[in-house]
Amino acid sequence: MMEILRGSPALSAFRINKLLARFQAANLQVHNIYAEYVHFADLNAPLNDSEQAQLTRLLQYGPALNSHTPAGKLLLVTPRPGTISPWSSKATDIAHNCGLQQVDRLERGVAYYIEASTLTAEQWRQVAAELHDRMMETVFSSLTDAEKLFIHHQPAPVSSVDLLGEGRQALIDANLRLGLALAEDEIDYLQEAFTKLGRNPNDIELYMFAQANSEHCRHKIFNADWIIDGKPQPKSLFKMIKNTFETTPDYVLSAYKDNAAVMEGSAVGRYFADHNTGRYDFHQEPAHILMKVETHNHPTAISPWPGAATGSGGEIRDEGATGRGAKPKAGLVGFSVSNLRIPGFEQPWEEDFGKPERIVTALDIMTEGPLGGAAFNNEFGRPALTGYFRTYEDKVNSHNGEELRGYHKPIMLAGGIGNIRADHVQKGEIVVGAKLIVLGGPAMNIGLGGGAASSMASGQSDVDLDFASVQRDNPEMERRCQEVIDRCWQLGDANPILFIHDVGAGGLSNAMPELVSDGGRGGKFELRDILSDEPGMSPLEIWCNESQERYVLAVAADQLPLFDELCKRERAPYAVIGDATEEQHLSLHDNHFDNQPIDLPLDVLLGKTPKMTRDVQTLKAKGDALNRADITIADAVNRVLHLPTVAEKTFLVTIGDRTVTGMVARDQMVGPWQVPVADCAVTTASLDSYYGEAMSIGERAPVALLDFAASARLAVGEALTNIAATQIGDIKRIKLSANWMAAAGHPGEDAGLYDAVKAVGEELCPQLGLTIPVGKDSMSMKTRWQEGNEQREMTSPLSLVISAFARVEDVRHTLTPQLSTEDNALLLIDLGKGHNALGATALAQVYRQLGDKPADVRDVAQLKGFYDAMQALVAARKLLAWHDRSDGGLLVTLAEMAFAGHCGVQVDIAALGDDHLAALFNEELGGVIQVRAEDREAVEALLAQYGLADCVHYLGQALAGDRFVITANDQTVFSESRTTLRVWWAETTWQMQRLRDNPQCADQEHEAKANDADPGLNVKLSFDINEDIAAPYIATGARPKVAVLREQGVNSHVEMAAAFHRAGFDAIDVHMSDLLGGRIGLGNFHALVACGGFSYGDVLGAGEGWAKSILFNPRVRDEFETFFHRPQTLALGVCNGCQMMSNLRELIPGSELWPRFVRNHSDRFEARFSLVEVTQSPSLLLQGMVGSQMPIAVSHGEGRVEVRDDAHLAALESKGLVALRYVDNFGKVTETYPANPNGSPNGITAVTTENGRVTIMMPHPERVFRTVANSWHPENWGEDSPWMRIFRNARKQLG
C-alpha cells in the first residue's frame, strides 16, 4: 500500500523566477508556479497512530510547508519507474534506523502546480520537458500515479541466442539489439568458441563478453599492431608508455597491473582508531602514495550531473580497491567542452554549429557536471584540490583540411591520490574456497552497457541505450564501503581482504571475472545471492548492470565473521555470492529458475581475442599564418581574459570541499583575497608531519590541431612547470598519469596519436627521468548528427591530459603566484627561447584563428635544468612567488599574480623582442619568479649554473597600488587598472554563478571583487597563540575520554579526533550503530563531539535524520539526555554535528532558543575560507578568545540560521548565546555574500547553551588546527593555528 505525505516547498523564489523567465523566453504563457516535495511511502503493513506521527515528523524538514491548497495544473516529477533514487535509498535507511520497519521504501517527487493561459498539448510537453531530466525522471499528472514507482515484476528468465540454428546472423542481430559494439572479428571469435562448446550462447554471456572486451576495458587500440604510411611500427602504444617505466623504474612500487599505480611515500604517523579499543593514535609507518586518473565522457554528455558524479565515484573506488585496500585522499577534476554561449554573454568567437539532440549543450555540462563531481567528492569526504577547464569549438584548417573541431563529446576527468600500507601494495593470493563478495549497494536496472556505449562515438548508439547507460550516484554508500575497507587495512597483517576490485563498466560481469582471473582462479556463483532492489530484473540485468558504489572482494572463509562484524558496524551492505575454484571456469547458477545463465571457461571470456591492426596514414596540418590586421593589444587582453580556459574559475572551485581531512596544505585559492590561481595542489602526508604529496595538471590540446607531438610534449612540460612550485627534490620522484582522448579512425588522428605517444613515451619522459605508471584512453571523441539536410561531425582535438604526482619533502615551502610588494624583482624564465609562437594559443582562438606554428618543448635539457633550479631555489627559500606561463601567455601570468597579490605591476618587455603581441600572448613553457631585490643577482647566477642564462629576463617589479603597466623601452605597450582586469577576468564565473545559483549572491560576490580597498583576510587575536593552556593538565598524565561520534556519511571525524588528541584527550571512535546496538554507552565519557559530513547524505534535512534516529529510539534518547544533564561534561557539534544537535533541543538544557540550520541563501554548497569573530558568550570552549577575528574553513550546503521570527532572534541575542559571527575583511558583522557564505542573520554561525557546556558551530576548527592546513595564514604562526585554543580550552575545563 502507498501513503502520500506532503513536504516542504521545493524551490526558492529565485529558482521559480528563473523557471518563469525560461517559459517566457520559449513563448509559453505560464503565469505562476508553486512547487513542493511530495513523499510516497510503500508500506508492507498499516501504521498505528504513533508510527504514523513518527513518519510524519520524520518527513518534516526544510522550510515550513505552505498550508494552502495549491492552484494550477499538476505536473508530478518523480524518478523513472524501475529506478530507485539515491534519496530513496538514504531516506529508507533513516526510517528503518528509526524503527519504522513497515516502510519498504520511501520515494520523493516534486509536485509542480502550473498556472498558465490555454496551452496546447505540445506546449504542455515543452513545459514538462523544462521541469525534469528525461534521463533520470518522469512526469505524471496525478499524485496516485506514483504507485507505478513501487510495481514489482516477476523475475525474468535468461534468453538464449540461436547461433547453432541461425548461424552468424543471430550474433549480428544480438549485437545490434543489445548494443554490444562487437567488431566483425569478435563475432567470428564468438561463433567459433560457442560452436566448439556445442551450445547456444545466452544473452548474458554475450553481454559479459562485450563489456569485458570493449575498447573501454581492453584498450584494443593501445595494444594494437601499427602500420603507418605502409611501414610496420616496432611497438604498440602501450609498449611505448611502458618504456618510461623500463627507463625510470625508481620509486615505483606498482604499475600497470592494479586499479591505481603506487609510488614510494614518506614514513609518517598515520592516525586511526584501534579495532579493539576504539582509541585513536598515531602509527609510524610508510604512507605510500597511490595515483589514478579516469575519464567519464560518454555519461557526462548524456546526463552531466550523474555522469560527472559517477566519474568521480568510480575513480575513488579505483583508489580504495588498490592492493589489498587503500585510502583515497584528495581529488582533481577537469572538463573540456565546446563553446559555452552563455545567454546574453555570448563571445565574438562563439558560433553555434548545432549538436545532436540526445546530448546536452556545453553550457548544461558546465552548469550541472561540476556540481555532480563536486557533490560526490564532498559527500564522500575527499577534497578536490586542482583541475582544468577548456572550451574549444570552431571550424579550422587542421590535418584533414577545414572541419569542425570541438568537444561536443566532452572530457570529464576525475583523478586523485591516496595512501596505502607497504604490506598491502601487492594483492594477496585467492585461496581455493575463498568467499567471493560484493560489498556495497544493491543491483539496480541502471547503467547498462556503459563500457560498450562509451566506446562508441556519440550519435552511433540507440537513444534507449544511451538512457540505459546513465548511472546514478550514492556517495554516502561509497563512504560506508570505504570505512569497511579502512577498518580492514588498519588491521595490518590481519586484514581479511585478500583481493579487491571496484565494480565499474560492465558491472559484476566485468568485475567478478577480473577478480578471479587476476587471482589465478575460477568462480562458482549464485545469481540470486546478489543484493537486488528490483525483483523483476533479468539475469542479464542483475549480472551486468552498473549500479555504483560496489566492490568485489575475496575473503578467506575463516575471516568472514570478522568481515561481517566490520560491515555491520558501518552499516555497509554486502553479499557472499560465490566461491573461488581451482579450475579457471566461470559458472553462474540461478536458484529461481534452477538453470545456468553462464557456464564458460574463463579463457573464452578473457582469452586471446583477435588482436587489432591499425593501418593508417599520416596527415600534416598546414594551418594559416595568424592574421593580425585587426588585433590590438587592448582588445586582445579583454578577449583573452574572457576566454573560459583563461578566465577565473571560482564557480568551479567554491562548490567543492577543499579542507576535509585537515591535511590540505595548498588548495586552488591563494592568499588573503582567495584568488583561484594555485599551480598545484599539496596535501600533508599525515597530521603529524610536513611531508606531503603534490598533484598538478598539464594540457595543451588545441596545439594538436597543428602538431600532435608538440601538444603531447607541452602537456608534460606544463605539468612539470606547475608541480615545480613545491619542494620535491629528484625529478624521478614525479610520476605521471597520461589520459589520451582521440577520435580513432578520423583521417590523420591515428597516426597523430602514435606520434604523440612516441614523443612522450620513447623520447621526452625518458630524457627527463619521468615515468608514466598509469593512464587511460578514450578513443571515440567524435559526435555525428543531422542538421537539416546536412550530415555534421564535431571531432575533438587529440587531447592528452597529463597529471603529475609527487612526494613532497616539506609542504611549507610551496610557492604561490601571490606577489609581495616588498623590494622585489620579477624575472621571466622563457623556456621557449624567444620563439614566441602564436599558433593554437588563446589569442588565436579568441580571433577565430588557428595560426600555423605552435609552442613546443624547445630544449629538453633546459626543461630539466629549469626543474632542478626551481627545486634548489624552493629549498633555499629564495623565491617570493612563482606562476607558470600557460593559456593566455605572459600577460595572463602577470595579471593572475597581480590579482593574487592585490597589487600593481610595472614591467618592461623590450628584452623579449620587437613583437609585443607575440611576447605577451605566446604560450611557450616557462613562468615568472619573484625574488627579493637583494637576491636577484644570486638567483640569476644559480639559474645560469643550471644552463638557463639565455632564458632569464628581468621584467620589472610588483608595486603597491592598482596599476598594471607594461612598457617596452619606457614606451607604454599596455596600461590598465588591475581592478578592471580583475573584473574582466571574473565576468565568466559571475555569469555562470548567476545562471546556476542565486543571482543576488553572484552579484554581491562580483561587486566585492571590484573593491580595490578590500584589505583581504586578516587576523586579530585577543590571546597568545603560542601559549598552550592545556600543558599543565597534559603533564598530569590524565587523558579524559572524548567520544568522537559519527553516523553513516560523516567524514570529518579523524581530524576532529586528532585535534582533541593534541590537546590531551583520549579520542574514542563511536559510531551511532555502537550506541543503537548497546555496545557502547556515553556514561564513561567526559566530552562528546558530533562531527561534520553528510549523515545519510543530508536527506530529510541536514543532520535531521541523524537527530531523529536518536529522538525516536527510547534507550539512546535517554543516553544522550543523561549525558547533557550531567555536570562536568562538554559537547561540541560541528557542521553536520551542529545541524544534528540543533535538532536535539528537547534534550539539551539551555538550548531552547537555538535556531535551525537550513539551505544556504546561495542555494549552493559553499566551501570558503571565511573570517569570523568570537563574541562574548558563555561558551566554555571559546573562553579567552573573545574579540578575536580569524579565518576558518567553511563547507556546507545548509548552514543558514533560521529563526521563527524577529522576537526569537532578539531573544537569542539578548541571552548572549551567539558564540561566532561572520565578519567582512573590514571586521564588520555581515550578511553579505560571500563573506557570509550562507546568509545567516546577524552573521550568526555558532551558538551555545546558557551554561556554555554545549557549543555548536557550522565552521570547521578541526580542519585548520594546524597552521599548515590554512589556505592563508600570517607568516609568524607556528605549528598550531589559533583554533587549537578551542580544544585546549576543553582540556582545561575538565581539569
Swiss-Prot record:
EC number: 6.3.5.3
GO BP, sorted A to Z: 'de novo' IMP biosynthetic process
Principal localisation: cytoplasm
Active site feature: 1135 (nucleophile), 1260, 1262
Superkingdom of source: Bacteria
Alphabetical keyword list: ATP-binding, Cytoplasm, Glutamine amidotransferase, Ligase, Magnesium, Metal-binding, Nucleotide-binding, Purine biosynthesis
Protein's UniProt keywords contain ATP-binding: yes
Recorded metabolic or biological pathway in which this protein acts: Purine metabolism; IMP biosynthesis via de novo pathway; 5-amino-1-(5-phospho-D-ribosyl)imidazole from N(2)-formyl-N(1)-(5-phospho-D-ribosyl)glycinamide: step 1/2
Molecular-function annotations in GO: ATP binding; metal ion binding; phosphoribosylformylglycinamidine synthase activity
UniProt-annotated binding residues for ATP: 307-318, 386-388, 678, 886
Compartments it resides in: Cytoplasm
UniProt catalytic activity: N(2)-formyl-N(1)-(5-phospho-beta-D-ribosyl)glycinamide + L-glutamine + ATP + H2O = 2-formamido-N(1)-(5-O-phospho-beta-D-ribosyl)acetamidine + L-glutamate + ADP + phosphate + H(+)
InterPro entries, per database record: Class_I_gatase-like, FGAR-AT_N, FGAR-AT_PurM_N-like, PurL_large, PurL_linker, PurM-like_C_dom, PurM-like_C_sf, PurM-like_N_sf
Residues that, per the record, bind Mg(2+): 679, 718, 722, 884
One GO location term (cellular component): cytoplasm
Domain Glutamine amidotransferase type-1 stretches: 1042-1295
PANTHER family: PHOSPHORIBOSYLFORMYLGLYCINAMIDINE SYNTHASE
Assembly with partners or alone: Monomer.
Family assignment from sequence similarity: In the N-terminal section; belongs to the FGAMS family.
Function comment: Phosphoribosylformylglycinamidine synthase involved in the purines biosynthetic pathway. Catalyzes the ATP-dependent conversion of formylglycinamide ribonucleotide (FGAR) and glutamine to yield formylglycinamidine ribonucleotide (FGAM) and glutamate.
NCBIfam families documented for this protein: FGAM_synt, PRK05297.1
Name this protein carries in UniProt: Phosphoribosylformylglycinamidine synthase
Organism: Salmonella paratyphi A (strain ATCC 9150 / SARB42)
